[in-house]
């Protein structure tokens, strides 16, 4: 899959150099850049993970395509919530986040610090993983169980709490609550220290696939609570994990959430446009970084609502005439 052809009048290298310098007028985008002359800092995610893989690949693409003097810095983080804190606090200039977390953080923020999207990237699905030989079949069965809801700062802990609330359990209804990342939750399930864990990621998620290769698992079907969750939080959608993804007994209904690439309103239009232009030119490299990124294209990339597109990104999509 190839990205749309660039329509910028200036070379991308010249464009971003001018944008980051904050001085030259860019006739191709009819704007005057005003971004400070600071290096790009990308808030990524946990290692290993899709976020950190895509962030690292984007850093390489932008350095090579746009002739940056230094490679963008990629930050290892707990995930969406921490990424949004870094972005809105000025410690990062670019971030990847679930759109629900981004929308929650953006509420009430106006002016230069307002989060704005460059693109929708791919969709995550929420996994609730249990051993196949267990008696757990629905979320309600987790009442009194030992469950990991994900680490603080991740994007999927809020999803886990919302799902548990919709099931009438809530976090207090669990027997023991842990806040483990995927590798730690994987190890804890293998060692029978927990009964279940929540995870939100692309399908397939490598860590879950590796676990399923060694330990028969099931994913809890979320179909009985999805309508209640979506009535309160329409940002979510319904998805399905096919049976053959992890050798499951059958397909599983799940909750799906979009992931978006974000900057703030402080970034000038020329820089924002150059970043997304370069990313689409090298979209196959993003797909190589993670199978989840195979679906990235400019037709679906505009679907970042309720987070607004940055004006520079909107210029790019309009010029691409591909939606």
Regions found by a protein language model. Name each.
Residues 1-10, 18-28:
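N-terminal secretory signal peptides
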Residues 32-34:
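Bacterial signal peptide processing site
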Residues 39-65, 70, 74, 124-191, ...:
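Bilobed "Venus flytrap"/periplasmic-binding protein-like clamshell domains
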Residues 60, 73-112, 128, 183-189, ...:
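Pocket-flanking alpha-helical
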Residues 111-121, 147, 245-253:
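A structural signal for short loop-to-beta-strand junctions that line the ligand-binding cleft
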Residues 118-125, 212-213, 223, 253-256:
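Short Pro/Gly-enriched coil loops immediately N-terminal to beta-strands
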Residues 125-136, 232-236, 248-270:
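A bilobed periplasmic-binding-protein/Venus flytrap-type ligand-binding module shared by bacterial periplasmic
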Residues 180-184, 190-191, 201-214, 219, ...:
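An extracytoplasmic/periplasmic, membrane-proximal ligand-sensing/linker region
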